[in-house]
Regions:
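Residues immediately C-terminal
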Residues: 123
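Non-catalytic, compositionally simple segments
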Residues: 127-251
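Pre-Walker A adenine-sensing motif
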Residues: 1-8
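Walker A/P-loop
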Residues: 8-31
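Conserved Walker A/P-loop ATP-binding site and its immediately adjacent core
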Residues: 44-65
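Walker B catalytic acidic pair
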Residues: 119-120
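Inter-Walker segment of RecA-like/P-loop motor cores
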Residues: 61-114
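Post-Walker A helix-loop "phosphate-sensing" segment adjacent to the P-loop in P-loop NTPases
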Residues: 35-43
Length: 251
């Protein structure tokens, strides 16, 4: 409860760093639907912000598909309580909407969204989050921004800033933010498959062991592929082209 007596989210910012193929988009879809139906934000707006329209569309379609994921939601959908419009997806009972937007700082200025999903933040060069968050913070009593990523190869961009921030002692004691950083601590740990759950906590379900092992084995003779495997699958920020693992190292 804030100083005005309004019930608000305790957590304003969440950073989720999770290995590729772990179902981040599906997880975000359930968060959006929960907000649209139960968030109490009459007339509120939610956004997915991605580096291009294709990726934004992927998350948007995940949310739309989830509207048919249960009997109750399917009834809502069939009776046009969930409605697709030119602007996005609307839950007509509360006039809450979900829209997609590309990573564009100018377009982000002056918004007033209540829930913001920043997808694949490892692709962002500049920090668009503050442009969006500023509008939410100033105009919404109850707002939340979620930054999701599998890690990536772009250095000194938004991703590196978020990792540094959410690993800091200051952020550890910040009650208004929360970080879930699933990643290896160093590249030596990749040689033992038992450590892979540090970056892929649901491995075996999403993603499948066989798929990750295949990528790992393909990368053993290729430094560039090793960089990508360590970055996207194991959450390690990589920038050089050394050999990190060979078939002889594998456990």
């Amino acid at each position: 409860v804030d100083e005005k007596g309004v019930q608000v989210n305790l957590i304003n910012e969440i950073f989720l760093n999770l290995g590729r193929g772990s179902g981040k988009s599906s997880l975000m879809a359930t968060r959006v639907l929960n907000w649209m139906i139960l968030g109490g934000q009459y007339g509120g707006e939610s956004l997915v912000i991605a580096y291009d329209n294709t990726q934004a569309r992927h998350v948007f379609d995940q949310v739309r598909n989830q509207t048919e994921a249960s009997d109750t939601l399917r009834v809502y959908n069939e009776n046009k309580i969930f409605k697709s419009t030119k602007q996005g997806l609307e839950f007509t009972s509360f006039k809450t909407t979900f829209k997609k937007q590309t990573n564009d700082t100018l377009r982000a200025q002056g918004g007033n969204s209540s829930l913001n999903i920043f997808d694949e933040v490892h692709t962002y060069g500049e920090d668009i989050t503050e442009s969006v968050n500023k509008g939410s913070r100033q105009k919404q009593d109850n707002w939340q921004s979620i930054y999701i990523t599998s890690g990536g190869l772009k250095r000194d961009g938004l991703y590196d800033k978020l990792v540094e921030r959410f690993k800091s002692e200051e952020e550890f004691y910040n009650d208004r933010s929360f970080g879930l950083l699933y990643m290896l601590e160093n590249h030596e740990q990749v040689k033992d498959k038992k450590n892979w759950t540090m970056a892929l906590p649901l491995i075996g379900d999403v993603p499948k062991w066989s798929g990750v092992i295949e990528e790992y084995e393909l990368a053993q003779g290729d430094p560039a592929l090793q960089n990508k495997f360590l970055a996207f699958n194991m959450g390690l920020p990589m920038q050089d082209t050394a050999y990190y693992f060979t078939p002889q190292d594998t456990k």
